[in-house]
């Protein structure tokens, strides 16, 4: 299935000059959403995943159905102040400043094989920070899965050494 036909390109969003890749039109189509999810599930099975991790919010949209299909848990990664119990945290650089991501301290057990999911691989900053959280907890990052990769932004380079699945490239 050509998943690109289900992605809507929105010019000048969120700011002028950006061509936003809207995944909601893929999600609106049950057949396309199922196909995309099934592709990631197949990849995850090959990696013998114990748990799926995803950063808010679109990483949840991708990761939760994958975890369900695999019969494994899902651990959310959230911005600081959003998780109610003790967390590990990582600060990471943005284009203008820094941000912080957190994860419950007991979300990953040492040695667990982890699949990290997100909708989009752009610069790789959010994914790199998510990897750092998983590894702080002793998890083994067995794979990274994205719906879309924006190749011109070079995020894959920031993630060298990790196995990456992208379903579409723009």
UniProtKB/Swiss-Prot annotation:
This is Adenine phosphoribosyltransferase. Disulfide bonds: none annotated. Belongs to the purine/pyrimidine phosphoribosyltransferase family. It catalyses: AMP + diphosphate = 5-phospho-alpha-D-ribose 1-diphosphate + adenine. Its main location: cytoplasm. The keyword Glycosyltransferase applies. The gene is apt. Homodimer. It is found in: Cytoplasm. InterPro entries: Ade_phspho_trans, PRibTrfase_dom, PRTase-like, UPRTase/APRTase. GO terms for molecular function: adenine binding; adenine phosphoribosyltransferase activity; AMP binding. NCBIfam families: apt, PRK02304.1-2, PRK02304.1-3, PRK02304.1-5. Catalyzes a salvage reaction resulting in the formation of AMP, that is energically less costly than de novo synthesis. Keywords: Cytoplasm, Glycosyltransferase, Purine salvage, Transferase. One of its GO terms (biological process) is AMP salvage. Its EC number is 2.4.2.7. It is an enzyme of class 2 (transferase). Pfam families: Pribosyltran (PF00156). One of its GO terms (cellular component) is cytoplasm.
């Amino acid at each position: 299935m050509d998943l690109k036909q289900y992605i809507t390109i929105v010019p000048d969003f969120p700011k002028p000059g950006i061509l936003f890749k809207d995944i909601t039109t893929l999600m609106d189509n049950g057949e396309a959403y199922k196909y995309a999810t099934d592709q990631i599930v197949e990849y995850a099975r090959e990696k013998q995943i114990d748990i799926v991790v995803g950063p808010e919010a679109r990483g949840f949209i991708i990761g939760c159905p994958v975890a369900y299909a695999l019969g494994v848990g899902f651990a959310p990664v959230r911005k600081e102040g959003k998780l109610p119990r003790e967390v590990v945290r990582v600060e990471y650089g943005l284009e203008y400043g820094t941000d912080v991501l957190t994860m419950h301290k007991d979300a990953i057990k040492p040695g667990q094989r982890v699949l990290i999911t997100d909708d989009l691989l752009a610069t790789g900053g959010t994914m790199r920070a998510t990897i750092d959280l998983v590894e702080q907890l002793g998890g083994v990052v067995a794979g990274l899965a994205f719906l879309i990769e924006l190749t011109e932004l070079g995020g894959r380079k920031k993630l060298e050494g990790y196995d990456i699945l992208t379903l579409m490239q723009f």
